[in-house]
Structure formats: structure tokens, C-alpha cells
Amino acid sequence: MSANLAPQIVEQLDPVDGPAFQRLTGCTDAQLADLTRFQALLTEWNEVMNLVGPATLPTYWNRHAWDSAQLLKLAPDARTWADLGAGAGLPGVVLAILLKGTPGAKIHLVESMTKRCKFLRAVADALDLPVEIHNARAEELDLKVEIVTARACAPMVRLLGYAQPYLKRGATAWFLKGQDVASELAEAATYWKFESDLRPSLSDPRGQIVQVKGLKSVRKV
């Protein structure tokens, strides 16, 4: 494993509401309305299925919307994405809202749990999003995308296995990770050879965004 672990100064950005989020991202009024509608749907469906921790819903704009949207700053020209373990629509639905109307934009939402796919379809239909929902395991699909991403999906050692087919087909990986990322990368390095680069999260001072390239299996997980 080759990793850039140098500490970096993070500008703390805390969009506590929709207008603050709009100032940070430059999103349109229509996109802001879609994100607000998504917030309502996420809150409604979360009452009957475990999509996100209930305690995180009051901080939706920072914890979920901005946490997801910051990926577009890392890959501003990417139009095709695959979100692995996309059950709550994070980051995939947020990306789809912000890319809606962009020529060639397509977000693949990959989720193995049927009931969560039902939620994703309800959101996609309500907001008319440029998404394709795959009720399947990530490693079973034959998708060619520019970026593969995931949030709260699996430890890095398993996540790399899910992402490997996408990387083989030319994708770059950007994974949203928390404060345990260093230990996750160390564990993953016993099974995989890869290059990684860490970027500080703009939504959480404890979080990191991990870029992965050059992935090769060393031994079976």
C-alpha cells in the first residue's frame, strides 16, 4: 500500500440549513428543492426501515447532503458513478440531484437489499433522477463507470473486493470513511496491493475521503 497520510488543514464548513448548503455548492433553487424533498422522503421512510441513524436526521444538510456533495469537488468532470451499498441514497441520490440535467449523467445505485431498493425507486420516481437501480451485489455487475464510491458500506478490506471489478474497467474509487480509516487501510494492505490518497472531509473533522488506484489482490479475504 502506498498512502498519503500527511495531516492537512481542513476548512470547517457547516451548512446547517438549505441556504447555507446552497452557498457552499452553488446549487440551483430547483436542486435545493429536490434535496429538501429527499430530506422529507428519507425521514418518512426511516420510520419503517433502518436507513440512517435517527439522531443524524436533524443535521441532514451537513451530515448527509454536504457529506455526499463534496465528492463532486474531487471529480467535477465525472458523469457516470456507481454508489455501492446505496441503500439510503447517500451519496448517490445527492449526486444524482446535483447532476440532473447534465448531459451524459448517470448514477448507478447498487443495493442488494430489496426493501432498500424500493425506497430508492420511490425517491428516483418522485424526483425524476438520472439513476439506474440495481438490486444486486456490487461484484456481480458488469458496469463501466468513471467513479465508484461508497459510504457506510463495509470495512475497507471488503469494500475493495466489491470495487475491484469497477477499477479493472477503468474507474477511480473515492470512498467516504470515518476516523478509523488508518486501521482499515492497514488491514486491507494485508490482502490487497493498492495506492491510496487521503483527503480530509469537509463535513466532518474526523472523516477522510480515500482515493484508491492500482488495486491488485495479494491473498483471498
Curated annotation (Swiss-Prot):
GO terms for cellular component: cytosol. Pfam families: GidB. It comes from the Bacteria. This is Ribosomal RNA small subunit methyltransferase G. InterPro entries: rRNA_ssu_MeTfrase_G (IPR003682), SAM-dependent_MTases_sf (IPR029063). It is found in: Cytoplasm. The keyword rRNA processing applies. The lineage of its organism: Bacteria, Pseudomonadati, Pseudomonadota, Alphaproteobacteria, Caulobacterales. Belongs to the methyltransferase superfamily. RNA methyltransferase RsmG family.
